[in-house]
Amino acid sequence: MTNTQVTLVQIDNYGPWTVTPEPRREVDLQTLQSRLYADLSQLIGNRMGYVFFTRFDNMVAVTNGLDADAHALIQESVGNRYPVTVSLSIGVDSSPAAALGTATDQLQDAGSAQDKGRTEILRGDPIQPSERTDTDVQIAHFDVNDATGKYTDQLNEFDSFINIEQGYAELMRYMRHENDSLSFFVGGDNIIAVCDGIDEAAYLDAIEHVNETVGVELKVGVGLDRTAQAAGMAAKHALETCREENTDVEFAR
């Protein structure tokens, strides 16, 4: 059974900060957000986790293996590098969606995202080392079948983007509501999903649903391990097996 540790990352009082003392240039805000994501990706990635940008002012990380001290150090590093601070909330559950729900509730209980007095909150209890297993995290790595041939080499970039995003949006909704899983677009034609130990039939159903609904064909490699990065690398290798053997779903062997 999976046991996913999810950390919600939220920039403190970000909306008001972007317009104080007057509205800040959008290009500067986009630069800050992208740099913060890059730094968090490295800070969490160096500890075998994954972070997904979602809306940039709110990000979702899979942090199995990171304890409370590691979270506090990440907070401190952000505070030292940026004119903004971040709050972190940790949830744990076999269901990634439920884990994120717990993390969200804890942070909302601490105050509004736009409360200037609510800064650098750190809440939640990470998984104890004695409770960790080699099957805690299931990562599924989806990509679009022949995205280059169907879209990149045939359509203008915006129309290609629309097709890829339609596939992502439909998969994201389906996986959330049918499988309690969290799916994230990670660039190109790639989607990474954090899943609740679902089986091959469930992945096939998801792929069929997306194809029937928006006409985007997908394949997926699935990995299972004790950290997000280890499971993610296993999923990438399984996806290569899909390409080599022309299959829709492969689990890491």
Swiss-Prot record:
<comment type="similarity">
    <text>Belongs to the archaeal-type GTP cyclohydrolase family.</text>
</comment>
<dbReference type="Pfam" id="PF05165">
    <property type="entry name" value="GCH_III"/>
</dbReference>
<dbReference type="InterPro" id="IPR029787">
    <property type="entry name" value="Nucleotide_cyclase"/>
</dbReference>
<protein>
    <recommendedName>
        <fullName>GTP cyclohydrolase III</fullName>
        <ecNumber>3.5.4.29</ecNumber>
    </recommendedName>
</protein>
<dbReference type="InterPro" id="IPR043128">
    <property type="entry name" value="Rev_trsase/Diguanyl_cyclase"/>
</dbReference>
<dbReference type="InterPro" id="IPR007839">
    <property type="entry name" value="GTP_CycHdrlase_3"/>
</dbReference>
<dbReference type="GO" id="GO:0009058">
    <property type="term" value="P:biosynthetic process"/>
</dbReference>
<keyword id="KW-0378">Hydrolase</keyword>
<dbReference type="GO" id="GO:0005525">
    <property type="term" value="F:GTP binding"/>
</dbReference>
<dbReference type="GO" id="GO:0043740">
    <property type="term" value="F:GTP cyclohydrolase IIa activity"/>
</dbReference>
<keyword id="KW-0547">Nucleotide-binding</keyword>
<comment type="function">
    <text>Catalyzes the formation of 2-amino-5-formylamino-6-ribofuranosylamino-4(3H)-pyrimidinone ribonucleotide monophosphate and inorganic phosphate from GTP. Also has an independent pyrophosphate phosphohydrolase activity.</text>
</comment>
<keyword id="KW-0342">GTP-binding</keyword>
